[in-house]
UniProtKB/Swiss-Prot annotation:
It is an enzyme of class 2 (transferase). It catalyses: malonyl-[ACP] + S-adenosyl-L-methionine = malonyl-[ACP] methyl ester + S-adenosyl-L-homocysteine. Converts the free carboxyl group of a malonyl-thioester to its methyl ester by transfer of a methyl group from S-adenosyl-L-methionine (SAM). It allows to synthesize pimeloyl-ACP via the fatty acid synthetic pathway. Residues 250-490 are annotated as: Malonyl-CoA O-methyltransferase. The lineage of its organism: Bacteria, Pseudomonadati, Bacteroidota, Bacteroidia, Bacteroidales. Keywords: Biotin biosynthesis, Methyltransferase, S-adenosyl-L-methionine, Transferase. This is Malonyl-[acyl-carrier protein] O-methyltransferase. SUPFAM superfamilies: alpha/beta-Hydrolases, S-adenosyl-L-methionine-dependent methyltransferases.
Length: 491
């Protein structure tokens, strides 16, 4: 197996330069970033088709050529976090090598492949695999790639960036995959997410569905072929990464003003803590995790009310550690990072948060992860926001988060948890004018992923319409918050 690291060009004598200016490194130079995206490409690939898909905030390391599954992790040894994406036959290769790698894995996504690549029910039917191997030549390789791409236009686009490996080498690789699959034990590695193309003509979609029944936490489907440049780009250079980065940046900027402006969030934190006191057993909690702790408003309430033996605080923003420094000690620790990707300590008794879950991309997968982490009597408890939240902003700008209803959230939880308590309320804040509303949102950081660009005319129109539509009384305008509170016990 070959591993290569790709990143934008820097001054170095230890690099190879492509026509695009991307650097491809086999070994030698230190990583540029603390985290890496480890991509297991499919059979017959090299780095060429993927050199335009560099992650915005991670190094990209590509694995390919599975004539051997010897996995040299030298390039990965200094990273603090590894995000794995695997495609096609790379899913099988990754499933084999990752369990014994001891890498700091934070997330794993499988695209159009399975851990059982040669299987009538869970992969490529053996007769088709053998036929491809026995008849492989330049002409049949191009036919395979045409089926892989799904359409003539996608195939022509792929040919411009196709790998240049000789067909005899590809035949050796395919034969080695068949031999190794028959000799090696089946993997039990569990993936965070599997993505299935419903028009995949290489790995039949029904077989993929069957393969993932026990080996992934979430299945995502899309209407596309086995090789889909858009899907690969979204996962190798995801907009999600940049949106999470934007969220972190905006909350970081609001650290100094958040405690004063976040009146509703403070009210919600007090109520959430009161509900926990009412509905959780009276005995003290040993291990508690709070995700999205922010400046520590809810954290301090948890400490005073429950005195846990250990409280793990987590936030997307590393800078929040400084805001919580007064409560950090041997009993209270801080773990920065994306809660959706991190692994929290197993045996935790309570996983909780206030005003955070609405930012998550895959809350259902997070609920499943928490169920695995909690002890037998554990609870998940959180507040989030419902569909009426900031309805004024959504109506006037067309932008906002995809809020879920209380019923939708409890339905998602009910497969794994007993619902202990749910409630919701509507809170209306009054401001002197619409400009104060915008200032309030900016000072609390809750503009989040919104990329609204304001011109003078747009701003004037926004203010006029806001006053016309959302003025409860003379000389004031309103802003709606719609908190939802949920406490659930592991079943």
């Amino acid at each position: 197996m070959k591993l290569k690291r790709l990143y934008p060009p820097q001054k170095s004598v230890n690099s190879l330069h492509s026509e695009t200016g991307t650097r491809c490194e086999v070994a030698g130079c230190p990583p540029l970033r603390k985290e890496a995206l480890l991509f297991f490409a499919g059979w017959g690939m090299d780095e060429t088709p993927f050199m335009h898909n560099l992650p915005p905030n991670k190094d990209l390391i590509i694995c390919y050529d599975y004539r051997s599954l010897d996995f040299d992790s030298t390039l990965l040894s200094t990273y603090e976090g590894i995000y794995v994406v695997a495609w096609s036959m790379g899913v099988w290769a990754a499933s084999q090598v990752l369990p014994d790698s001891n890498l700091p894995l934070k997330q794993s996504i499988a695209i159009n492949g399975t851990p059982f690549p040669i299987d009538d029910m869970r992969g490529i039917p053996p007769a088709i695999f053998e036929g491809t191997l026995n008849n492989l030549n330049e002409a049949t390789l191009q036919k395979f790639r045409r089926r892989m791409c799904g359409s003539g236009s996608a195939f022509q686009a792929f040919l411009e960036i196709a790998p240049q490996r000789p067909v005899e080498e590809l035949k050796e690789e395919l034969a080695a995959i068949g031999r190794q699959y028959s000799e090696l034990p089946l993997s039990t590695f569990v993936w965070n997410k599997a993505i299935i193309g419903e028009s995949d003509h290489i790995f039949p979609p029904k077989n993929q569905e069957q393969a993932w029944q026990k080996y992934c936490n979430e299945i995502q489907r899309y209407d596309g072929a086995h090789y889909d440049e858009k899907i690969l780009k979204e996962n190798l250079a995801p907009a999600a990464a940049s949106s999470k980065l934007l969220i972190a940046q905006r909350f970081t900027k609001a650290i100094g003003t958040y405690p004063h402006e976040a009146r509703v969030q403070q009210q919600i934190a007090r109520k959430m803590c009161s509900l926990l006191q009412q509905h959780l057993p009276a005995h003290s909690l040993r291990r508690v995790v709070e995700f999205g702790c922010g400046t520590g408003t809810y954290s301090r309430l948890l400490l005073r009310s429950f005195r846990p033996e250990h409280l793990l605080l987590n936030d997307l923003c590393e800078e929040m550690r400084h805001s919580c420094r007064d409560i950090l000690n041997e009993r209270v620790s801080f773990l920065p990072g994306d809660a959706e990707a991190l692994d929290f300590p197993h045996g935790t008794e309570l996983i909780t948060s206030c005003s955070v879950l609405q930012w998550f991309e895959h809350p259902d997968a997070f609920f499943r992860k928490c169920e695995n982490i909690l002890n037998a009597q554990g609870y998940i408890a959180f507040s989030t926001f419902g569909k009426e939240n900031m309805k004024e902003i959504r109506q006037l700008t067309g932008q906002g988060l995809a809020y879920r209803s209380r019923e939708e959230l409890t339905a998602s939880l009910s497969a794994l948890y007993d619902i202990v308590h749910t409630e919701e309320e509507v809170i209306s804040l009054n401001f002197n004018n619409p400009m104060e509303v915008l200032y309030h949102l900016k000072q609390t950081g809750v503009t989040g992923t919104c990329n609204q660009s304001w011109t003078r005319s747009k701003l004037n129109l926004f203010c006029q319409e806001y006053e016309r539509l959302f003025s409860p009384g003379k000389g004031s305008v309103s802003l709606t918050y719609h908190p939802i509170y949920i406490i659930a016990k592991k079943r």
